[in-house]
């Protein structure tokens, strides 16, 4: 199998991002987004996915973190899509349920090329680590649509916003590990392609 990795550099008036991803890594990360909580969450996701992720971002944080987090998700989704290549042999579907202290979160993904997000964040507090909870909905939406994946995140219960999001990122990492595992011959689709 060819190496499943990709890299992108993207500069706009709002952000300057460079991102390298190796799907078949060891969970090693070098992340500096300027948003400490995001660094923590992306490190957790990468560890549980087994991704090697090198990410640098300089964003317009003097405004807020919205552009930074949304653009990181767009670039991560694009790099993930490129690194997956033709998707031959992958399981395609992955899922995980993760407890984090009082919180329980389930994530289910389908790397079918059909982008969709199901994300009910009513349980999340309005502010998490200094950011409005809506910024995380935009993060996951941008990731799902740019990666071409169906992403369901279910916050089953919990009180602490940090714990709920940490559970989501860990579960997403485990779901990626499962979905990207190569265990089949050909493409995981009765129609013969994933696009």
UniProtKB/Swiss-Prot annotation:
Q: Mind telling me which PROSITE patterns this protein's record contains?
A: IGP_DEHYDRATASE_1, IGP_DEHYDRATASE_2
- Enumerate the catalysed reactions: D-erythro-1-(imidazol-4-yl)glycerol 3-phosphate = 3-(imidazol-4-yl)-2-oxopropyl phosphate + H2O
In which pathway does this enzyme or protein participate? Amino-acid biosynthesis; L-histidine biosynthesis; L-histidine from 5-phospho-alpha-D-ribose 1-diphosphate: step 6/9
Keyword set for this entry? Amino-acid biosynthesis, Cytoplasm, Histidine biosynthesis, Lyase
- Indicate where this protein resides in the cell: Cytoplasm
What Pfam families does the entry give?
IGPD
Among InterPro entries, the record links this protein to: IGPD_sf, ImidazoleglycerolP_deHydtase, ImidazoleglycerP_deHydtase_CS, Ribosomal_Su5_D2-typ_SF
Classify the source by domain of life. Bacteria
In short, the EC number is 4.2.1.19
Its cellular-component GO annotations read: cytoplasm
Q: Name one GO biological process term.
A: L-histidine biosynthetic process
GO MF term list: imidazoleglycerol-phosphate dehydratase activity
PANTHER family, sorted: IMIDAZOLEGLYCEROL-PHOSPHATE DEHYDRATASE, IMIDAZOLEGLYCEROL-PHOSPHATE DEHYDRATASE HIS7
Family label: Belongs to the imidazoleglycerol-phosphate dehydratase family.
Note the HAMAP family from the entry: HisB
- Name of the protein in question: Imidazoleglycerol-phosphate dehydratase
Q: Which organism is it from?
A: Maridesulfovibrio salexigens (strain ATCC 14822 / DSM 2638 / NCIMB 8403 / VKM B-1763)
């Amino acid at each position: 199998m060819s190496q499943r990795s990709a890299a992108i550099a993207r500069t706009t008036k709002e952000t300057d991002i460079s991102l390298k991803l190796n799907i078949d890594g060891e969970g090693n990360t070098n992340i500096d987004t300027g948003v400490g909580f995001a660094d923590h969450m992306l490190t957790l996701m990468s560890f549980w996915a087994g991704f090697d992720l090198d990410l640098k971002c300089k964003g317009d944080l003097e405004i807020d973190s919205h552009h930074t987090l949304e653009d990181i998700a767009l670039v991560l989704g694009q790099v993930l899509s490129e690194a997956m290549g033709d998707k031959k042999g992958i399981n395609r579907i992955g899922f995980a349920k993760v407890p984090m202290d009082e919180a329980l979160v389930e994530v289910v993904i389908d790397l079918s090329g059909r982008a969709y997000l199901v994300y009910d964040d009513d349980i999340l507090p309005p502010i998490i680590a200094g950011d409005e909870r809506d910024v995380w909905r935009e993060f996951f939406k941008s990731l799902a649509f740019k990666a071409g994946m169906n992403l369901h995140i279910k916050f089953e219960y919990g009180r602490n916003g940090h714990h709920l999001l940490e559970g989501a990122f860990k579960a997403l990492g485990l779901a990626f590990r499962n979905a990207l595992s190569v265990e089949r011959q050909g493409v995981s689709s009765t129609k013969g392609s994933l696009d």
